[in-house]
Amino acid sequence: MADDMVKEQIYTIPLREVRKVPAWKRANRAVIEVRGFLVRHMKTESVQVKLDKSINEHLWEKGCEKPPLSIRVRAVKFADGEVQAELAQ
């Protein structure tokens, strides 16, 4: 699995724009924003971006109305174009 790894990067993803949507949609929108950021910066399609459970738990930690303003993510892109992302330590 390490042989076909192409690119590994740690990103700080800003989620300030999520505060502009209705409160009950914010955590859902944050997941969409994280996926969109990774699609843009890792140059892949959205169906090939896999978010780890830890990212989802961090975004939903304070409920759907109060996601964090930013999140640090470690993203790994493989040779087949798939991107796996997990919460950076």
From Swiss-Prot:
It holds the Pfam family Ribosomal_L31e. SMART domains: Ribosomal_L31e (SM01380). CDD domains: Ribosomal_L31e (cd00463). SUPFAM superfamilies: Ribosomal protein L31e (SSF54575). GO terms for molecular function: structural constituent of ribosome. InterPro entries: Ribosomal_eL31 (IPR000054), Ribosomal_eL31_CS (IPR020052), Ribosomal_eL31_dom_sf (IPR023621). One of its GO terms (cellular component) is cytosolic large ribosomal subunit. One of its GO terms (biological process) is cytoplasmic translation. It comes from the Archaea. Keywords: Ribonucleoprotein, Ribosomal protein. Belongs to the eukaryotic ribosomal protein eL31 family. NCBIfam families: PRK01192.1-1. This is Large ribosomal subunit protein eL31. It comes from Methanosarcina acetivorans (strain ATCC 35395 / DSM 2834 / JCM 12185 / C2A). The gene is rpl31e.
